[in-house]
Amino acid sequence: MMKVLVVVALLVTLISYSSSEGIDDLEADELLSLMANEQTRKECIPKHHECTSNKHGCCRGNFFKYKCQCTTVVTQDGEQTERCFCGTPPHHKAAELVVGFGKKIFG
């Protein structure tokens, strides 16, 4: 009976060790994926920053991705140039307001 208990304990130890190694491998892969996502976040353009040269590079907000909004600026010389910034479109602001209000009411 003692031999059976020793063999069972040994098997449990081996199984737990091998499964923990597999979990460590998965965690390492997830860590690499998270690092790649973090690099992408660093490269995106934050809210209220200029996006004239990269109109699709705005970061994500709380619920939606910011949109590159452009306006035409007339200089004192009369030249027209386009200036763009990352911002939240009005319909996204309205949706965020409704969701925030719903969270306050329903907890």
Swiss-Prot record:
The keyword Mitochondrion belongs to this UniProt entry's keyword annotation: no
Domain-related comment: The presence of a 'disulfide through disulfide knot' structurally defines this protein as a knottin.
Disulfide bonds: C44-C59, C51-C68, C58-C86, C70-C84
Organism the protein comes from: Lycosa singoriensis (Wolf spider)
Protein known as: U1-lycotoxin-Ls1b
Gene Ontology MF annotations: toxin activity
Keyword Signal attributed: yes
Protein family according to the UniProt entry: Belongs to the neurotoxin 19 (CSTX) family. 04 (U1-Lctx) subfamily.
Alphabetical UniProt keywords: Disulfide bond, Knottin, Secreted, Signal, Toxin
Top-level taxon in the UniProt lineage: Eukaryota
Signal sequence residues: 1-20
UniProt tissue specificity: Expressed by the venom gland.
Location (main, coarse): secreted
Propeptide span(s): 21-41
UniProt cross-references to InterPro entries, sorted A to Z: Spider_toxin_CSTX_knottin, Spider_toxin_CSTX_Knottin_CS
Location of this chain's protein in the cell: Secreted
A Pfam family of this chain: Toxin_35
Cellular component, GO annotation: extracellular region
